[in-house]
Amino acid sequence: MAQLYFYYSAMNAGKSTALLQSSYNYQERGMRTVVYTAEIDDRFGAGKVSSRIGLSSPAKLFNQNSSLFAEIRAEHEQQAIHCVLVDECQFLTRQQVYELSEVVDQLDIPVLCYGLRTDFRGELFIGSQYLLAWSDKLVELKTICFCGRKASMVLRLDQAGRPYNEGEQVVIGGNERYVSVCRKHYKEALEVGSLTAIQERHRHD
């Protein structure tokens, strides 16, 4: 039986690398995969999933208006799909998460979703909220804070490198805008108004 998987983490935990490896594993066995990524995130070029270690794959784009079940069913009828993989799945809508569950339940195709659990305010993304609620399997991909603890929070930095937790939920950026930290240092960095000061303090403790 196919299942719906949600692989979640903070930033820079290797989600895209894990997705590309999973897709490769299917293809190596002669199976066909379809990869989706969010249209909104074009840091590495539109229409592909890229990892920080240099791997990449062509990808279909989804936005808030995409009818994922209809798209996948139509393509599956043309040529059998053995696995659907979705990067940046935090940007899915509630309806799209439901449609992906229908891909699993009605078409018997496994769906592997990779994304962030929470935003820079510590709030769940809509897509992540419903994947946490409806997935068959939840898998945490771990990354670490500068202190060595598990990083479960994401700090957003302004142009001067100062952390803040107000404003639009979605601002596309890489390492220069977002930093993964543990909960303790997330709170301390916001209180002090400086991630650098917290890192320096930790080094001298």
UniProtKB/Swiss-Prot annotation:
Keywords: ATP-binding, Cytoplasm, DNA synthesis, Kinase, Metal-binding, Nucleotide-binding, Transferase, Zinc. ATP binds at S9, A10, M11, N12, A13, G14, K15, S16, D87, E88, C89, Q90. It is an enzyme of class 2 (transferase). PROSITE patterns: TK_CELLULAR_TYPE. One of its GO terms (biological process) is thymidine metabolic process. It is found in: Cytoplasm. It holds the Pfam family TK. Gene3D superfamilies: 3.30.60.20, P-loop containing nucleotide triphosphate hydrolases. Zn(2+) binds at C145, C147, C182, H185. GO terms for molecular function: ATP binding; thymidine kinase activity; zinc ion binding. It catalyses: thymidine + ATP = dTMP + ADP + H(+). It comes from the Bacteria. GO terms for cellular component: cytosol. Its EC number is 2.7.1.21. The active site is at E88 (proton acceptor). Belongs to the thymidine kinase family. Homotetramer. HAMAP family: Thymidine_kinase (MF_00124). This is Thymidine kinase. The lineage of its organism: Bacteria, Pseudomonadati, Pseudomonadota, Gammaproteobacteria, Enterobacterales. The gene is tdk.
